[in-house]
């Protein structure tokens, strides 16, 4: 657990953050200049700050103590590349590993394994100046991981990587951070990255924390509260956790369970019991008062209406219906955008049980969420 209660002034920015970061992957989100990088640098001990900073039972900073950056065992991936130009890729990677070994840290991640997962085997003898931007990013992340960190700070680490590389690296990062229980702060402006990779979210504005919670709670709120600088990055919708019941190869159909309710999506073969996350766009959720029959829409979830809000400013004539999926385990929120006319015609109101018709769903890689 990382506990933060710090203040720091830098030019026009006054940073003031008080929060606790769990041992999970937490997204740090906000507009440019809001203090995300400054906060990471303060946590790492690279930027002066005042206040209290503790990690687990160790005090990193208070009125009388400031633990130097190199003794905090933090893996930091900066926005710009920080590779040593006079060393080869392999020597850069060994630098992080050897520092950990010199400090008596147990080595759980080896260079061959990390190089394989980041596809660096063919780059090991090259110098950083000969690498592309995407290759440099991969080496930077790998070196941070090989340092056997007890905390990872990733400042837009996948910048410059194409979607295929991101799809390869994100599952591995998620796997090692969860298996080794490395708390991670992850700065990104990309909605899909946050949805797939992060368990929790922190939203910052003008140096302050303005929202915090699970990704499934916070990410859908960003659109409604207009906190995103670009609404294309925060499409209205919901993140739903599900698990794979079986795969039907005849139809390329994944049969899922959302709590005790079935749901089907087209997708690749996935191992049974894999935990996955779905994105359901609010515009793709319809509402019925009775179980529908003879429809091409195959997915229906029983849910209870929590609230109905007119969208007069964003989309006149529409209402945002917030629902809770009926299930015996932890409730999951679901958003639907329907016309005000349909809402009135169905006499919808808070507390009513309805049937949510899911027109489409976007699925994330199951390997990100396997326990």
Please place each PLM-identified region on the residue numbering:
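ABC ATPase NBD coupling module
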Residues: 60-75, 99
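Internal alpha/beta loop-helix hairpins
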Residues: 178, 188-261
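Conserved ABC ATPase "signature" region
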Residues: 58-62, 105-123, 174-175
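Conserved ABC ATPase signature
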Residues: 127-131, 135
